[in-house]
Amino acid sequence: MKKILAMALALLFVAALFTGCSKKAESPSEPNANDVASDTTEEVKEKTSADNTDADSQTVKIGFAIKSTGSSFYQALATGVQNACEERGWECTVLNADMDITKEQENVETLIGQQVDAPIDASAEVITTVYNNNTTTAFMVGKYIPQFFADDELISSVVLSGGKGNTGGTERRQGMVAGIIAERMGLSEEEAWSEAAKFDEDLIANGHAFHEGANLEIRGQAYCNWLASDGLDGMEDLLVANPDINCLLSENDDMALGAQKAITAAGKDNQIQVFCAADGSKEGYLQLRDNPQWRVIGENSPPKVGALAVEIAGQVVLEGKTANDFDAVVMTEANIVTSDTVNDFYDPDSPF
């Protein structure tokens, strides 16, 4: 029986469905990084045996049954898997299901029939789940925000969310709020997350929320399916209702890219600062580099997630590791990208 490794991207995407960047579908819940044990990228590398150099020279066949390659995000994910295999001299087959669950199951069966050593599937019994360090990254983004406002200035924001009830989106939204609260009030991370959870309950229940201690308000929320086009529509509506805001919090940069068009059209480029919990697309990094009102983006790199999944697959195939050797979730390193560091992350040749 072949070992199957499930791979998931935090925020949007977990075992059942990759939806965030190309389909207008409600994203399913994903594992909550606060509720499961996790390895970091470095810990996984430390667990790799000293014989790995010899192991990498062996021929391994990796198969990736991907939900879709219909967007640059998915393309970059597949490319990350392919490049990681190529670096090791391994064979790699990517089969695209075009968002068809039946076809995806058929693709997995095809890969097993082709005797690949490790089929990577997004909806299988898992060795482990690999994704971006969602909560830590969003919290880091939030802590970075207050420096751009005077100590006694009200941070008056709206928020763009991907999908109702999406666990990853909730983690990102609450993470940014928790970071702001922690930085402005000097609270511990645990205390700030507790405050952020209560704040988020008010936001979901009432459509707006205010935190007196942090002098932070979110005056409106729009669900924009992780898409720039919906971010444009959502921001247009939010600006009509809330013309005096000075801040935009977005759960990903694609929605913020659409929102930026609405901000510019409304003549509010110099009024509203933009902060994104993720993802780090090429277009987002260009805004961060060239637009002084874009301040920070949390990194959610599909190539890095793909590469880490291949690394773990190699440990399973070549070293005989099992689910018992990994935590339930293995996460990539948490990074935030700012205007000072964006050139270290921006890749003009990136497919994403």
List PLM regions with ranges.
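Positively charged n-region of N-terminal signal peptides that target proteins for export
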Residues: 1-11
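C-terminal motif of bacterial Sec signal peptides marking the signal peptidase cleavage site
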Residues: 16-20
